[in-house]
Amino acid sequence: GRAQGARPRDPAELAAAWSARLDAAARDAPVLVPYVDAVRAVYDAVAGLPEPILAHRVHGDLHLGQLLRTTHGWLILDFEGEPSAPLHERRRPDSPMRDVAGMLRSFDYAAFFQLLSSDPRAFADDRTATSPLLWHAKEWTARNRDAFCDGYAVRAGVDPRRHGPVLRAFELDKAVYEVVYETRSRPGWVPIPLSSIKRLTAGATSGSSAG
């Protein structure tokens, strides 16, 4: 059944919001400029979807840091939404794929943060094809992304990977935000979200693919 308060959202409306954020992000983080057209193409694909996107109240800032494991199971914390977003946007119904994308991005960070900490040049072009640590990080990420999507499908009755274009667009929107954040706060970490943007705009066909 539908989640409480669910309502349809226009895909073109979502895509327009993503594009506006992309333009602003490219101004703040010029490293994004070479990817703007490819990212916008993903957004445009969502804008052209024939059916509305089901939306309801979501967490809005879901990632591994918002989870707490207890003896009674997992708890989800902090339902205030994205800290940088205005309050009216945090309260607005949104696609649950936003929260799924947040978790998938979090798996990337969990793997590649460790890699980058041990090898600052891990993402250098001359290293990506031969680095065993990078290969293991990608494999770990792919395995955990798939496990999360499998579990989500069992509990929610909807496999996020069946919403590939929408999920990929939400992942890109999150990664674009991360590039700006890292540019301002931790420049050495910019390769983490930037590598995901490269993957997500290079013909990935599955929301769970880690490339």
Can you annotate each of these PLM segments?
Residues 1-60, 70-76, 82-93, 97, ...:
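ATP-dependent phospho-/nucleotidyl transfer catalytic cores
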Residues 63:
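Acidic, metal-ion-coordinating active-site neighborhood of RNase H-like domains
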Residues 105-108:
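A conserved short helix in the protein kinase C-lobe
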Residues 111-114, 183:
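Long alpha-helical scaffolds in large eukaryotic adaptor/regulatory proteins
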Residues 113-123:
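Short acidic alpha-helical/loop segments enriched in Asp/Glu that coordinate divalent cations
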